[in-house]
């Protein structure tokens, strides 16, 4: 039985205004009073509240194109992302230790027939029309994975916005199925097998695939033509997770399944909008 994980991220929202005061450092309304914002902070290094598993980012979307086409700039960009080297007191990069890799649905191969207007929101897939796997696909993503490995990154998360178009109900990488999964009823096992096979391929290539995130922000319908995506109900996610668990076990992989993906904090802990797509923690854990 694979492990089931939940990784939570913090979204910080910043508001800006065109009405900048003449003296930004002053406050207190019309009084002109200066308000002190000094704070005293004490850090106890001996007390641990949580463990950070990794510091990561995602290759979705433009790195796929930078890695494939921008050969003059990609080496420096990858250094900025992954290097932890410090020279003369200056870091050469931000030292990412985790890299999130998009398992695209194949809309890039469809071109304009994909229905996705923005070319940068189309993504390649390893799955071909005859349902074989072509490991020469996703060249740009493979470049960044290899560079991450060179710089010592040892945690990779495979994630999916949509099932491969060969398995979707509408043959597209975006959904027209409302809040339900854009996945044929008889293709849950096929989709799971595909994700597990990609994970095994990269494990065999020497990459540590720590997690697979099989769905992305499932509370949204993704029924526009802006990018790849699919809505999912909790019971559909559970069914897919069981199939994926079986496939990972069969292949002898220790890769964990990342559940609890959510488009909004509140979907995690309470019923919001659609009960069948929210209260995620109670539904899965």
At which residue positions do the language-model features occur?
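Sec-dependent signal peptide recognition
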Residues: 1-9
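Residue-level signal for mature regions of secreted extracellular proteins and peptides
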Residues: 9-10, 50
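Disulfide-bonded cysteine motifs in exported proteins
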Residues: 11-12, 77
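Bacterial Sec-dependent N-terminal signal peptides
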Residues: 13-37
């Amino acid at each position: 039985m694979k492990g089931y994980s939940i990784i939570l991220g913090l979204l910080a929202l910043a508001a800006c205004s065109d009405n900048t005061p003449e003296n930004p450092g002053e406050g207190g309304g019309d009084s002109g009073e200066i308000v002190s914002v000094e704070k005293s902070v004490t850090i106890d290094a001996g007390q641990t509240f949580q463990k950070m598993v990794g510091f990561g980012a995602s290759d979705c979307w433009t790195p796929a194109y930078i890695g494939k086409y921008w050969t003059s700039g990609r080496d420096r960009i990858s250094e900025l992302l992954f290097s932890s080297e410090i020279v003369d007191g200056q870091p050469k990069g931000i030292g990412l230790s985790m890299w999130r890799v998009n398992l695209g649905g194949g809309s890039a191969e469809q071109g304009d027939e994909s229905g996705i207007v923005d070319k940068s929101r189309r993504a390649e897939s390893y799955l071909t029309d005859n349902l074989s796997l072509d490991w020469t696909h996703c060249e740009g993503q493979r470049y960044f994975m290899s560079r991450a490995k060179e710089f010592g990154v040892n945690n990779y998360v495979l994630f999916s916005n949509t099932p491969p178009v060969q398995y979707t109900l509408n043959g597209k990488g975006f959904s027209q199925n409302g809040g339900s999964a854009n996945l044929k009823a008889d293709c849950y096992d096929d989709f799971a097998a595909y994700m597990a096979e990609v994970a095994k391929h990269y494990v065999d290539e020497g990459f540590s695939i720590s997690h697979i995130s099989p769905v992305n922000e499932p509370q949204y319908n993704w029924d526009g033509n802006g990018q790849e995506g699919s809505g999912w109900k909790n019971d559909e996610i559970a069914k897919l997770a069981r199939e994926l668990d079986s496939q990972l076990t069969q292949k002898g992989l220790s890769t964990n399944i990342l559940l609890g993906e959510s488009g909004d904090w509140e979907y995690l802990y309470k019923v919001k909008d659609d009960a069948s797509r929210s209260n995620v923690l109670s539904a899965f854990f």
